[in-house]
Amino acid sequence: GGNITVQIGDEGILLVDTQYAPLSDKILAAIRAISPKPIYYIVDTHHHGDHTGGNANLRAAGTTVSGGNMAGAIRDSGIGAAIIAHENVLLRLSSDKTPQALPSGGWPTSTFFGSKKELFFNGEGIEIIHLPAAHTDGDSIVFFRRSDVISAGDVFVTTSYPFIDTASGGSYQGYVAALEKLDDIIIPVYGQDGGTLVIPGHGRISNLGDVLNYRE
């Protein structure tokens, strides 16, 4: 499955992606070994099952948000963590024409249409940035501003050459533009020796040099 990013702070826990459903118990156990805080948010970087398969399980293990620390209203999502994603992720996960569609319990409960959604959680500004027609038509990267960390989803991986899912709206031009957007955000000297840390969809934690090499 894909990498999962976990943000833990005084307010609670935010996850980026959820891997496959059969791994949910192990994932939750690993999180609980670090913190007993409630899971309030899950962010889907795109709709593929190795990143969203655990949505329903980890949502059910979470806690419903109360209060207004997110820009944009949350749909009536029942009990559990809020699942945030671009609208195209919801459209694909809820479509009977999508091979990797999920039951409704795994669908995003809060979606956005534009280029970005902003969240303030655990004392940190978080930007969820849509990258149109890249790996798919629903890709987002998640930028943790204070931590100087980007969770990149499958627009950047270290384990293979780029895969463009054209059947799901991906394109070569969009993929290149997504990598250029990553380059624009990454700061090579701030915070740590390698600058902004980039968590790929698959593979090891990386930095600007790795992203530039991948783009070439």
Question: Where are the regions that the model predicts?
Answer:
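Divalent-metal (often Zn2+) His-rich catalytic cores of metallo-beta-lactamase-fold enzymes
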Residues: 149, 173-216
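Active-site metal-binding loops of divalent metal-dependent hydrolases
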Residues: 18-19, 47, 88, 154-155, ...
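Residue-level marker for buried hydrophobic side chains located in beta-strands
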Residues: 14-16, 43, 83, 149-151, ...
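Metallo-beta-lactamase
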Residues: 73-131, 136-137, 145-146, 178-186, ...
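Histidine-centered catalytic micro-motifs
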Residues: 43-50, 131-142, 199-203
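Active-site metal-binding motif and surrounding structural segment of the metallo-beta-lactamase
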Residues: 9-14, 21-81
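Conserved beta-strand hairpin/beta-sheet module of binuclear metal-dependent hydrolase folds
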Residues: 1-30, 140-144, 149-154
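Second-shell loop/turn segments in exported
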Residues: 13-20, 162-168, 205, 210-212
